[in-house]
Regions:
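Gly/Ser-rich catalytic/binding loops embedded in alpha/beta enzyme cores
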Residues: 1-124
Length: 124
């Protein structure tokens, strides 16, 4: 996927197909980099964390629920470091672009997720 707004965590590639027959089948979603995705490290907005911990053994409840519903996970998104911010600015990964107002920050610790949806990178 081409990330035109800097919403996805750099250097990551995450794709997990959802259940084929769920009510969300055909929809895509991204997960904030605070949610565990089985087989992938959870960085929490800090580039050093993934190298110092094992990949997640299972999906976070929210991620698994969306997958069980049929949605397909297509990436992990930037967050303020350890989700401690209100602007969506990450000194390590950069600030995602606010498609609706490029001269303004996307805002909130879920800025990467919001930027991804606004830019059409995913549905949810």
């Amino acid at each position: 996927m081409k990330d035109t707004v800097g919403a996805l965590v750099p250097g990551t590639s995450v794709h997990v197909d959802g259940a084929a027959d769920g009510p969300l089948s055909g929809l895509t979603f991204v997960a904030k980099d605070l949610f565990d995705v089985a087989g992938h490290p959870t960085g929490g907005g800090n580039p050093d964390w993934p190298g110092n911990q094992a990949p997640a053994k299972e999906n976070a409840w929210a991620v698994q629920t969306l997958l069980d519903g049929g949605a397909t996970l297509v990436g992990k998104t930037i967050t303020d470091e350890v989700s401690l911010g209100i602007l969506g600015e990450n000194v390590f990964h950069g600030t995602p672009v606010n498609s609706a107002a490029p001269d303004r920050v996307p805002g909130g610790s879920s800025a990467g997720s919001a930027a991804a949806v606004a830019a059409g990178l995913c549905d949810i």
